[in-house]
Amino acid sequence: MKINMKIFIFLTTFQYLIDIQMYPCNNIKGNLILYIHHLVDIYIYFGGFLFNPLYHLIVVIITLLHWIKNDDKCFLTEWSNSICYPEYTEYKGFNDFSRMLGIQDKYPTISYYYLGFVILYDLNKI
């Protein structure tokens, strides 16, 4: 397995394990959706550095359009929340590294700025 794929799997699994320690999910289907969400999240944030920047650019643009169209909410977050955390009546943001470190709470739009940065990076690498 190539080093980039190992880094990707490590970051995904590490983030997922921290997440389920903070917010346990007691549902097998919910855990599968949550792990897939962590895969997508790590790809969005690091995929351009690890893999093909053109494919990454396409995924990032689709993600941004989805967030904008869906009132800054991710369908994967809503889906996993409905299965793992039905007690939350309001939207519970996805627990990724930036939220775990308190960055999302201090700078709620930081994801948009970071994705703007990775778009510029991807365009430079294409």
What spans do the regions from the language model cover?
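Solvent-exposed, well-ordered amphipathic alpha-helical segments
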Residues: M1-K6, L50-L57, Y121-I126
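Alpha-helical transmembrane segments and their cytosolic membrane-interface
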Residues: M1-Q21, N81, Q104-L115, I126
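Hydrophobic alpha-helical cores of multi-pass transmembrane domains in eukaryotic membrane proteins
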Residues: F8-L17, L39-I42, I58-I68
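Juxtamembrane "helix-exit" motif on the non-cytosolic side of transmembrane helices
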Residues: L17-N26, I68-D72, L123-I126
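Long, highly hydrophobic alpha-helical transmembrane signal-anchor segments
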Residues: C25-I58
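Core segments of transmembrane alpha-helices
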Residues: L34-F46, P108-Y121
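Hydrophobic alpha-helical membrane-embedded segments
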Residues: F51-T77
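Membrane-proximal soluble regions of multi-pass membrane proteins
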Residues: K69-P108
